[in-house]
Curated annotation (Swiss-Prot):
It is a single-pass membrane protein. The gene is SPATA9. The lineage of its organism: Eukaryota, Metazoa, Chordata, Craniata, Vertebrata. It is found in: Membrane. Pfam families: SPATA9. It comes from Bos taurus. The chain crosses the membrane at residues 144-166. May play at role in testicular development/spermatogenesis and may be an important factor in male infertility. This is Spermatogenesis-associated protein 9. Keywords: Developmental protein, Differentiation, Membrane, Spermatogenesis, Transmembrane, Transmembrane helix.
Length: 253
């Protein structure tokens, strides 16, 4: 695998992030504004887990409020692109770091062999000049390779930390979305039960007819003028009137 220089890697990273730097910078500045007051208190919290739990809840709430103000579509798209690019950078830097370590080990083995080799006679001074130059330049080479290895390791660690932060932010987004959906469902459920639904009538309006009220017949004035009936006929008339009243009462009920 050909070894790519660090400048080319940085160029590829900037090329992948071009067009999204402003949105990412805005998100980072919003997060810094939300959490800049809490950094001193977070650094002091190292005594017990009981003191840490109350501080994490408001910080999560503030993070959720800060992230809710940002456009979610662009933020999620930018986070996904950053995650993909960071993973690609980590995959690209891992073999280069291993190659540099192998080169350093080979140089150290060769130097040890040359140091432990038997001394050359005095007439072979020109051959020893090359080995002396390598001995003198070895500290510079080791320092340079160690700096490069440290920079590669720092970049890999940074990408891992960025991926962890992105995963936490995605989890917070998912929790907020689920809470919002549950709240909407509960509100819809309450509205459905608070507004009574009128059931359709069992009978159509055309078939329902009100029965006329039957009042008692008024006493005519001519009754007093009529002759009195015998007792038997009078009792029969009274029974007939009682039966009529009973039927009218049943019909009214």
């Amino acid at each position: 695998m050909p070894i790519k220089p660090v400048g080319w890697i940085c160029g590829q990273v900037l090329k992948n992030f071009s067009g999204r730097i402003e949105g990412i910078q805005k998100v980072i500045m919003d997060l810094i504004d939300e959490f800049k007051d809490e950094f001193p208190t977070i650094l002091r919290l190292s005594q017990s887990n009981q003191k840490r739990e109350p501080m994490q809840k408001p910080s999560k709430i503030r993070m959720a409020i800060a992230l809710a103000k940002i456009n979610r579509g662009t933020l999620i798209q930018g986070l996904n692109s950053i995650s993909r690019s960071s993973k690609s950078v980590a995959k690209l830097l891992q073999p280069q770091l291993a190659c540099r370590l192998l080169e350093l080990r080979a140089i150290s083995h060769r130097l040890l062999k040359e140091v432990n080799a038997p001394r050359q006679p005095l007439y072979n001074i020109q051959v020893r000049k090359g080995s002396l130059f390598e001995i003198i330049s070895f500290p510079a080479k080791t320092a340079l390779t160690s700096i490069m290895c440290a920079s590669y390791a720092a970049l890999i660690y940074l990408t891992v930390c960025v991926n962890a932060v992105l995963e936490k932010i995605m989890k917070i987004f998912q929790e907020e979305e689920s809470i919002r959906q549950n709240r909407e469902e509960s509100e819809n459920f309450r509205n459905a039960f608070s507004e009574p639904v009128l059931s359709e009538p069992l009978f159509p309006e055309g078939e329902i007819k009100a029965k006329p009220y039957r009042s008692l017949p008024e006493k005519p004035d001519s009754i007093s003028d009529r002759p009195k009936l015998p007792a038997n006929k009078l009792s029969n008339k009274i029974q007939v009137l009682h039966s009529v009243f009973d039927q009218s009462a049943e019909m009214n009920e």
